[in-house]
Curated annotation (Swiss-Prot):
It catalyses: Endohydrolysis of (1->4)-beta-D-xylosidic linkages in xylans. One of its GO terms (biological process) is xylan catabolic process. It is an enzyme of class 3 (hydrolase). Keywords: Carbohydrate metabolism, Glycosidase, Hydrolase, Polysaccharide degradation, Xylan degradation. This is Endo-1,4-beta-xylanase B. GO terms for molecular function: endo-1,4-beta-xylanase activity. Residues 1-337 form the GH10 domain. It comes from the Bacteria. Belongs to the glycosyl hydrolase 10 (cellulase F) family. B.fibrisolvens is located in the rumen of ruminant animals, where it contributes to the animal's digestion of plant material by hydrolyzing hemicellulose with its xylanases.
Length: 635
């Protein structure tokens, strides 16, 4: 008995997949054996349809009818056709992952926004083009579309580039266009998160679904259902489910997962119990007629693929499969909600080792290796638990001399977040540089102040790379450091204090620790009013001296020889106040240090390089979490 068979009498069971799943045979086999529906996690969002190059090359030709490309969507559609698996289309209209240039005159971000009628014409043409391509070339494959995604925020319509340029009725227009061009058998959905919250539930029912139902433009409500172990309460969720169901619309559970950062047996049992409780709720609502649930989709296949580890900044174990397609207790709990125990068999994936290898995607010839930057007798941070700070290399396998990027992940000085390591390193590797990720000293317990140890780590790392410049093929080239969040504080500390850090090892004493350039991403800068308190506490302890606070308040420490800096952050950053980047930029200006400073209006803290891999939930580079995992097991 598998999931799709157990739930066939009631509703479709699906999973979201990324391009990495699609190119890993074991994952596609798991999908085909267990599920009868899937969603493309990332590659069918607006930015992947809109052809930037074509539209910018001939803006007059495409002014009212943007050029589209389907190269990202086609592999998923082909897989669905070949394997006879139905698809949910996700998503046509969203405030995220829709390029700003789509809204601008001549498709140029440096031009003013186009007028309402122009943007509506573009929207209609875009929706028509996507639906026509899919329905002509892959008829019957996509059974439902998320037409509009996530337009409600803080008890009102979300302020977005759509409301700024078109107005709050943009979602109605989108549904009008979708209804006009969708095949009769295709269902049209509104999709959102936190849909069980009473304030959001009521607003969606009245202001979003109400007018769409009145105009007969909508067929279903999508409840994303990114759940926590203690939120929402099942009764609150059930109430919302039944209230949406009372509209007569189909209900899809579109992005189901349950964030859980504890992999212990006890915690995974609790996860299983909660999954069974929710699936029992779905079945009860379906059988009683209180909600016409027609599809439930898990938001990816395996724990290791989940977007939550990057989003939550900690490893998450939120799904029902893990590792080599192994079934967790939660898998059997989901089955038990639908069928009797005696009809449930143990799931044993019969896949070869070759099936677990990425296939069909170009893989660069990268020299990857790790090297400790300290000898054991040089490094004595008391809460290291056997960890030694190290560099992980991403080098081109050739003899070409290249510039070097040293990446410093963030993590509040509590950890080195994996999604802020390898993703960034590979971005620069793909642009022709050699790259390294530094796993520096952190303290997940926040009990043993780090003081200058992270600064000494990055100073040694710069010297270590330069000492081995010939081996790494970077001799005579620039070495730039790039940090994220607290990792930016590490980078910034070196930028202003490189002269202070003396290396006692004679092999490194005469090697410069000054980087040639610095990139600071959503940086922690100050220890003053706008500080990130947890970072400062982990670094300096609960009772730092005034001298320590001043030393590590980087806006007060800029020198005449501070390297050139590139700084970026978002206005919406809710973790590190945007004033941090302004403070450092102003200090650089006063010292006449070359710099660039960008503050983007939208975007959350932790965006890293915001590329396809990031938004698909892939992070890689788990090696950066070594000290944290050692501490976890030790403490």
């Amino acid at each position: 008995m598998n999931l799709k068979t157990a739930y066939e009498p009631y509703f479709k069971i699906g999973a979201a997949i990324s391009r990495w799943n699609l190119h890993t045979p074991a994952h596609t086999k798991l999908l085909a054996e267990q599920f009868n529906s899937f969603t493309c996690e990332n590659d069918m969002k607006p930015m992947y349809y809109l052809d930037r190059e074509a539209n910018k090359k001939d803006p007059e030709k495409y002014n009212l009818s943007p050029a589209l490309t389907f190269e990202n969507a086609i592999p998923y559609l082909e897989f669905a056709k070949d394997n006879k698996i139905a698809m949910r289309g996700h998503t046509l209209v969203w405030h995220n992952q829709t390029p700003k240039w789509f809204f601008c005159e001549r498709y140029n971000e440096n031009f003013p926004m186009a007028d309402r009628e122009t943007i509506l014409a573009r929207l209609e043409s875009y929706i028509h083009g996507v639906l026509d391509f899919v329905q002509t070339n892959y008829p019957g494959i996509i059974y439902a579309w998320d037409v509009v995604n996530e337009i409600v925020d803080e008890g009102a319509f979300r302020k977005s580039i759509w409301t700024e340029t078109v107005g709050e009725d943009f979602f109605i227009k989108a549904f009008e266009f979708a209804r006009k061009y969708a095949a009769p058998e295709v269902s049209l959905f509104y999709n959102d998160y936190e849909t069980a919250q009473p304030w959001k539930r009521d607003f969606i029912l009245e202001k979003v679904l109400g007018p769409l139902i009145d105009k007969k433009l909508i067929d279903g409500m999508g409840m994303q259902s990114h759940l926590l172990m203690d939120h929402p309460d099942i009764s609150e969720y059930r109430t919302a489910l039944e209230m949406y169901g009372s509209t007569g619309l189909q209900i899809h559970i579109t992005e189901l997962d349950m964030h859980n950062a504890d992999p212990s047996e006890e915690s995974m049992h609790a996860l299983a119990t909660r999954y069974q409780e929710f699936f029992q709720t779905y079945l009860d609502a379906k059988k009683s007629g209180k909600a016409n649930i027609t599809s439930v989709t898990f938001w990816n296949l395996l724990d290791e693929n989940s977007w939550l580890s990057g989003f939550r900044r900690e490893t998450s174990y939120p799904l029902v499969f893990k590792g080599k397609c192994e079934a967790k207790e939660a898998y059997y709990a989901v089955l038990k909600a639908a069928v009797s125990d005696d009809s449930i068999d143990k799931w044993v994936p019969d896949y070869s080792e070759e099936d677990y290898k990425l296939q069909g995607m170009p893989t660069p010839d990268i020299k990857r290796f790790r090297e400790n930057i300290w000898q054991e007798n040089e490094y004595n941070y008391e809460a290291s638990y056997g960890f030694i700070p190290n560099l992980f290399a991403y080098l081109h396998n050739d003899d070409v001399k290249r510039d070097c990027m040293l990446v410093i992940p963030g993590g509040g000085y509590c950890m080195c977040c994996s999604h802020e390591g390898e993703l960034a390193a590979m971005e620069f590797y793909n642009r022709g540089m050699n790259a390294f990720v530094l796993s520096y000293t952190t303290d997940i317990t926040m009990s043993v102040p780090l003081h200058k140890q992270p600064l000494e780590d990055i100073s040694r790392a710069v010297r270590f790379i330069r000492k081995n410049a010939s081996k790494y093929n970077i001799d005579g080239k620039k070495l730039v450091i790039m940090g994220f969040s607290a990792g930016s504080h590490v980078c910034g500390s070196l930028a202003v204090h490189f002269d202070d850090v003396k290396d006692n090892n004679p092999e490194y004493a005469d090697i410069s620790g000054r980087p040639d350039g610095v990139i600071l991403s959503y940086p922690v800068i100050t220890t003053g009013r706008y500080t990130h308190a947890d970072s400062v506490r982990t670094l300096l302890g609960a009772n730092p001296t005034d001298e320590e606070l001043t030393y590590f308040s980087l806006e007060k420490q800029v020198k005449d020889n501070t390297p050139p800096c590139f700084i970026w952050q978002t206005e919406e950053d809710s973790v590190v106040p945007v004033e941090n980047s302004y403070l450092f930029a102003n200090a650089l200006r006063e010292k006449k240090i070359p710099f660039a400073h960008y503050v983007f209006p939208r975007g959350f803290h932790g965006l890293t390089v915001a590329n396809d891999e990031f938004f698909s939930g892939w992070s890689g580079g788990e090696y950066s979490m070594e000290q944290t995992m050692r501490a976890r097991f030790a403490v």
